[in-house]
Amino acid sequence: MSENKDHVVVGYTEKPVGERPTGGKFLGYDHLHFWVGNAKQAAGWYTSRFGFEYYAYKGLETGSREVATHVVRNKQGVTLAFSTPYGNDKDNQREMNQHQSLHGDGVKDVAFAVEDCHSIYNKAIQRGAKCAYPPQDLKDEHGSVTIAAVHTYGEVIHTFIQRNDYKGFFMPGFVAHPLKDPLNNVLPDISYNYVDHIVGNQPDNMMTSAADWYEKTLDFHRFWSVDDSMIHTEFSSLRSIVMTDYDQKIKMPINEPADGKRKSQIQEYIDFYAGPGVQHIALNTSDVINTVEGLRARGVEFLSIPTSYYDNLRKALTAQTSITVKEDLDVLQKNHILVDYDEKGYLLQIFTKPVEDRPTLFYEIIQRNNHQGFGAGNFKSLFVSLELEQEKRGNLTEIVKNIY
């Protein structure tokens, strides 16, 4: 259990629950696949702003006549893929164009690295998961990759990827990316250890069914949860459940809006994304201050946190003796980095502003110091900051309830 300065009490599971499920293990996140309007520009933006490097490519020059895909990754292996159709003649191109028209740029595939693709896929299908595509072996001179995919919430899919010691670039059919970003030679180096968690937003009253899907089809279990009695502001509130696999390599928080006086940032996402989808991606770092300062130098915009938050934080930390925050609080305040803690440790986190024109996808940078929570003590301060941005966009509107 965790109790922090705002007296928010949450529970999370520190150890695997029950017996190991049959079949192969989940090994972690393999990559995130975005469907976008211009894959080349999107990949370039992530190299210049977030410090990724060009990694792999598939397009006209490689014989791919229908879709172009640019893949970026960092030195630690965090991998993002961006795809754009060349036209609208084929079924897959029409699907991508319709997705773009409805949702804007967004995450289509949260791909999981797995030990046994066939086993995990077959079990999911037997338990009611809907097939996106069945198992197939992709091969080239560098080896083979086994993949299969199922639909999850909204139009998001999960691809199960078994790499079979594949030695090539990303996937069979890809080549080394021909571009190098010269800005990476002059801008600060950015280091992310891994994808910490990926958050999905659901419409009201859909969170539990989405969480249950992970438990039923993938043998995930509930790791952490909070409800609207804990997380609320004057205007809005949320509920959240975090689902994880047996080995806790993958963490998938599921959010939904709760009743409030005005439209919450969860509902704003649902409205502008036109349904459920990936709200934010959390990237783990060992040095959040250095990472954030480097990202700011590259032009990444972050939310602002009021001075009162840090005044209250200093008082709360002084009043307890369980943990010591090693970082300079003045530097954390200067960078608008949030702190949450329990009796065992603490975490540092910060959130970007939306990275699309639509107020949908954003990023979190997180540093964990023996703390496995998700910043429940910061949710209220975060919500207030998000509501200020909503108000600028004209979206912090009153909710009119239908009384009939």
Curated annotation (Swiss-Prot):
Its EC number is 1.13.11.27. Keywords: Dioxygenase, Iron, Metal-binding, Oxidoreductase, Phenylalanine catabolism, Repeat, Tyrosine catabolism. Residues 28-163, 194-353 form the VOC domain. It catalyses: 3-(4-hydroxyphenyl)pyruvate + O2 = homogentisate + CO2. CDD domains: HPPD_C_like, HPPD_N_like. GO terms for biological process: L-phenylalanine catabolic process; tyrosine catabolic process. SUPFAM superfamilies: Glyoxalase/Bleomycin resistance protein/Dihydroxybiphenyl dioxygenase (SSF54593). It holds the Pfam family Glyoxalase. It comes from the Eukaryota. Pathway: Amino-acid degradation; L-phenylalanine degradation; acetoacetate and fumarate from L-phenylalanine: step 3/6. Binds 1 Fe cation per subunit. Its cofactor is Fe cation. Fe cation binds at residues 197, 280, 364. InterPro entries: 4OHPhenylPyrv_dOase, 4OHPhenylPyrv_dOase_C, 4OHPhenylPyrv_dOase_N, Glyas_Bleomycin-R_OHBP_Dase, Glyas_Fos-R_dOase_dom, VOC. GO terms for molecular function: 4-hydroxyphenylpyruvate dioxygenase activity; metal ion binding. Key enzyme in the degradation of tyrosine. Belongs to the 4HPPD family. This is 4-hydroxyphenylpyruvate dioxygenase.
